[in-house]
């Protein structure tokens, strides 16, 4: 029998039992010397309660399955509604913490970090050992710009060395917190550990080059990007970072080549046209620069934000 048919059957039975009068019904006693006797009112209540619990359990399971399916489709509103219904059915169940955690993650996905922090904090008051929840709260704090509270949660996590979390994820988050606090060497230490654990990790290499540049080491950042692009010549972020550094060194033709490649690989990124237009102006190619600025406007960047560049044409 399919799940939906079973649910319909359970609910029909529950409705029937609820509507029945509490007057005597026939029940078979299967105990020793079994006999036929009348069902009492108390037994009727117990039977109805059992059916209701069964129906609620079936609905709860259905809500959870459909909720996670909705999450996989990025249908946040649908998932939220289903998880909230599951909580209403069994608010004190051991699994309720998982439901609440996912509701908090839905708020995270909506960039409603204040609501997510509220949900995660309520969970951690009762379950301080829930490392995934603490990790998500630290992430929210960082998104809110509160590096101090993010650091406090991260210190707890690093001290616990949780096996439920990937160490690389912890190192990435701590590096991001250090970057926010302008502790660039601390950030680099964590990112270098990520590379020791995962030598081909492109994100760690990119972030290391950014940390080098922020730490006043632009040549080291450029060298790192050169190595990365030898292995990954079509990594758009690396191309853009290298072009930015080359432009900073006054190597505008080299920067232009990298922007050309980046735009070929990711033509939908409007900001790339603005970056290339700035370099084209330095190269004296005003006609090409105008085309790039117009393309950036066509792709959604407000013309008012580009007035200073238009004035250079």
Briefly describe each language-model feature range:
Residues 59-89, 105, 109, 176:
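Alpha-helical segment of the N-proximal tetratricopeptide repeat
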Residues 60, 94-97, 131-132, 164-169, ...:
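Helix-start (N-cap) detector for alpha-helical repeat units in TPR-like alpha-solenoids
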Residues 65, 98-102, 136, 173, ...:
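Canonical tetratricopeptide repeat
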Residues 72-73, 106-109, 143-144, 176, ...:
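Register position in tetratricopeptide repeats
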Residues 89-92, 126, 160-163, 197, ...:
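Structural marker of alpha-solenoid helical repeat scaffolds
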